[in-house]
Amino acid sequence: MSYTPVTFCKVDFRKLIPVQWHLWIGVFQVLFVFIAVGFILFFKLRGNGLILMESILACIICPCASAAAIVTQKLGGNIEDMTTYTFLSNFICAALIPICFPLIEPNVNVGFADSFLVILNRVCLILVAPILVAYFTKHWRMLQPLYKWIVRMNNLGFYFWAFTLTIVTGTTVKNIIHADTTILFLVFIALVGLLLCLAQFAIGRFIGRFFGKTIEAGQALGQKNTTFAIWIAFTYLNPLSSVGPGCYILWQNIINSIELWYYDKHTHTS
């Protein structure tokens, strides 16, 4: 995504190290995944019940969005902490998928090696490639004028993100409208997605309070790579469960918009 190299130009690469709150956010993500899988297995869910829980699982198991670093920076948080956790969450996801998905979808045969290669490929495309571009832009003398211009443009990454978000949201709405199910069930999935989104942001912020990292931890647990969630739903689960992550895109960005508005208002009035 074009906004990530712009954002990573402002990262201090020496500070990309795991910190204590990363562990707790990761632990809670794993715990929530096991609770969702356990619920499916214990109640032997089938039909719409299984689709609903699979849509929830896809929203929990998927990694933190790379855009979380942009929002965190706009909210005055630590961009290095967020960038580091984005990498870590991708590996958590890679470990959980081959463990959990074969349990709820017997036809799914996901090996650890295959899963890790798929995740690593996506990590390289979404994170590693942009961060390498940013690193060379920052340290290569020929590109110093470009680097200085990017640093001066405080909102450049945010504008790229907003543009990308508009396209993704439009595609998501189209997919939801054409979903092969009843309106009532779509509304129910959307409402459950809203509750899940609020819960993940709230729990993340609660954990972050103990480390003075409310903004970062809330974004880490709440803002998800929903494009990846939709892909895993189509690839490994019932394709209809992709509606859950599709709705989650809308909810998480409404929450982000409210947080950005509140932060901007508070900053200008203080």
Positions of PLM-derived features:
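Alpha-helical transmembrane segments of multi-pass small-molecule/ion transporters
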Residues: 1-270
